[in-house]
């Protein structure tokens, strides 16, 4: 039984790194890790306030001895695993980046969570005890190296704890969508009073639940916030934002670090928008024609919405 384990949550970034003959770089978990002997992509936890692209460069260097540069986003995944010997269950939101080697040489490690870094062909990797997220990222059959909890524990998507300086801090993973319909309208939501960005138009979406995949979370949030049923078209990117003293309905400053995955979503059969989650962070939802969206003053859009709409070339 895993239901009595303490639930934890983290965000992590990993590297898909291949060489000139298409071998992939993997690292082995040491006896100090929760899954000794298993192999995974190099990477690790995103520090509070850290850009995940910096995380993947830092962690790859530490675990392999190689300096890498980020070429692009490969995938966004989520998984749960139980570690009964430590008394915990961990949900990890994993940002997987494609990287290229700038220099350095492979280095083994002692008394660290990983101990070896090696290059493998895909066929060789297939024979290894791979962490499930690594197998998924490489398009290989998933293994049973991880112990999966019996069921997801209760755990809030927003969870603030006292930081080392005494100020509450929260790191939150969320999924948002640039949503369009067959008439090329764009769906936006308005932020409720009392929340950061109150009164501004925002992308549909929000925090993912414990044990939930980001795509599934986004489709759920779309229904709750707008009453629309959508389908995922593609992954646009990931953004990281820190507000060192964010003010929300809690009524006190929070050192807030948000990591957001952005998707393109299409609603094939649009309906008049309705907000089912009354009293939450969304007070209104509306379809905008392209010209209406382009005419909105910049200060009427949240910063992340303006950036995402521009990236999707909708204005």
Model-derived segments and spans:
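A short coil-to-beta-strand element that immediately follows conserved catalytic motifs
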Residues: 67-76, 229-238
């Amino acid at each position: 039984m895993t239901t009595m384990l303490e639930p934890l949550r983290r965000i992590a970034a990993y590297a898909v790194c291949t060489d000139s003959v298409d071998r992939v770089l993997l690292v082995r978990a040491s006896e100090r890790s929760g899954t000794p002997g298993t192999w995974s992509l190099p990477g690790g936890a995103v520090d509070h306030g850290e850009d995940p692209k910096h995380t993947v460069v830092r962690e790859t260097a530490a675990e392999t001895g190689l300096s890498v540069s980020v070429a692009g986003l490969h995938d966004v995944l989520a998984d749960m695993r139980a570690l009964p010997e430590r008394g915990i269950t961990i949900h990890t939101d994993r940002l997987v980046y494609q990287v290229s080697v700038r220099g350095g040489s492979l280095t083994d490690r002692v008394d660290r969570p990983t101990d070896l870094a090696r290059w493998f062909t895909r066929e060789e990797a297939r024979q290894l005890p791979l962490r499930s997220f690594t197998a998924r990222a490489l398009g290989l059959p998933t293994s049973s190296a991880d112990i999966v909890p019996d069921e997801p524990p209760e755990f809030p998507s927003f969870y603030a704890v006292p930081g080392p300086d005494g100020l509450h801090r929260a790191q939150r993973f969320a999924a948002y969508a640039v949503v369009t319909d067959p008439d090329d309208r764009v769906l936006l939501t308005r932020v409720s009073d009392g929340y950061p960005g109150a009164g501004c138009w925002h992308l549909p979406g929000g925090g993912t639940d414990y044990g939930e995949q980001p795509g599934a979370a986004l489709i759920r949030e779309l229904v709750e916030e707008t009453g629309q049923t959508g389908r995922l078209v593609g992954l646009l990117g990931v953004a990281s934002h820190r507000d060192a003293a964010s003010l929300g309905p809690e009524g006190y400053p929070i050192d807030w670090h948000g990591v957001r995955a952005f998707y393109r979503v299409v609603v094939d059969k649009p309906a008049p928008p309705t907000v089912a989650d009354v009293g939450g962070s969304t007070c209104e939802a509306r379809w905008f024609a392209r010209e209406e969206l382009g005419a909105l003053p910049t200060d009427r859009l949240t910063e992340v919405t303006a950036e995402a709409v521009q990236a999707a070339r909708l204005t």
